[in-house]
Amino acid sequence: FVPEWNAENCIQCNKCAYVCPHASIRPFVLDAEEQKGAKFEQLKAVGKVFDGMTFRIQVDVLDCLGCGNCADICPGNPKKGGKALTMKHLESQLAEADNWTYCAENVKSKQHLVDIKANVKNSQFATPLFEFSGACSGCGETPYVKLISQLYGDREMVANATGCSSIYSGSVPSTPYTTNAKGHGPAWANSLFEDFCEFGLGMELANEKMRARICLLYTS
């Protein structure tokens, strides 16, 4: 089962994306140019900063693990009386794969238009730099990891403690950590069974040393 979006009941709160363990459901805001090629339902985006733009919750049905967290958290529209997300058989939602591809490849992030640290809704307009991990369906850790990557991922350094996070973050040959449009993203390393706090301190000291060396080269 995967979630199906009912635009009529959506209040654009973005809570569904906030709780998703795998970043497989996201809000997209489309400008006039991006709307031209979109062949799916959209809503008028709420907020003055999104004037003339449209809003859509898009599910990546091929990466969704069907935990149902998004449908559970969805408050729906009190005036309409129903949730905006309901779980449906995957076979009935396969057409959404093309819609996801369009959004992912053609719709640019609008996070620069809002303060992504102001509230839950705004935070989810930021592109996740942690996505499609090998974590279990409904994982309670990865939504936090994903959120940190949205807020600080372009300059994030992770000293990972051994546990579930070392498995879903570093399963060769892939990694759930990714980069933004500028090529910036988290730096991740795992110390296995060592003291990860000390390991992280070493990363910080090394970073400071490299920055100091760059400054020295520029001034000498």
Regions flagged by a language model, labelled:
Residues 218-219:
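Conserved small/polar residues in nucleotide/adenosyl-binding loops
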Residues 34-36, 92-94, 100-104, 172-181:
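Short secondary-structure boundary/capping segments
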